[in-house]
Amino acid sequence: MGVAVQLGEGTEDIIYGASSIPAGPRTFGGYLSRPDGVREWPTIVVFGPRTEPTSSIKNICRIFARHGIAALAPDVGSDEKRARSIANASAAFIMNPAAAWSSAEYGFGVLAFEGGLDLAANLVRHVPTVIAFATVGAALDSSAVDRLADRTIPGLYIGSRGDEGSGVDASLEVQEALPTTTFAVYPDGDTGFWSDDSPGYSEERFVDTRDRLIGFFGLHLPERS
């Protein structure tokens, strides 16, 4: 792992790099970025649009860490059953009291970009310690909503009318089923508006998305000194 003060957003010294996620006799891979200070930091698990953490997802994890929020992005693989197992192992990893850098045992968040919503929704349903969720560029279909609605926890939906994958109109129709979820909709912004390695990337939309996510998780996740 590297140790650095990154230029740009945030002020925390951070540790970041490849991380091993233990699960019994097996070990899975992922990317972890966290503040370098001695403290139990608020923590999120991040699921991106691909099975492995992309450069954009890694960058977002580092940004969270510079703002005092640890972020773990697991490499979930292509097999659906295995992916859910790895997602569960990631939750157990950060909730382990031996992870002295994380306050996840007292509550943590999940963040999904595009297709990562399925795994995030599963954790919301099955892991009571998930206390907040956010999704970016992903349609809230009936399958996801059924799982998210099992829990009355704070949620944040961010989508763009210029991004078909956001499914804005369909997602807005489920607001009644998710009464504690805030909906933020951009009038424009192409597919991948949040991802700096996407042709549809928008600096303006990314900055606003970043600020909304940091503010949301900063408000709802526990921090312990």
What are these regions, as identified by a protein language model?
Residues 180-225:
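C-terminal catalytic histidine-bearing segment of alpha/beta-hydrolase fold enzymes
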Residues 151-152, 157-159:
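Short beta-strand/loop motif that positions the catalytic acidic residue
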Residues 127-140:
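A conserved short beta-strand
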Residues 81-115, 221-222:
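Gly/Ser-rich "nucleophile elbow"/oxyanion-hole loop immediately N-terminal to the catalytic nucleophile
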Residues 40-49:
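Short beta-strand element of the alpha/beta-hydrolase
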Residues 55-81:
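Short amphipathic alpha-helix adjacent to the substrate-entry channel of hydrolases
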Residues 1-38:
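N-terminal cap/lid segment of alpha/beta-hydrolase-fold proteins
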Residues 166-176:
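Short alpha-helix in the alpha/beta-hydrolase fold that links the catalytic acid
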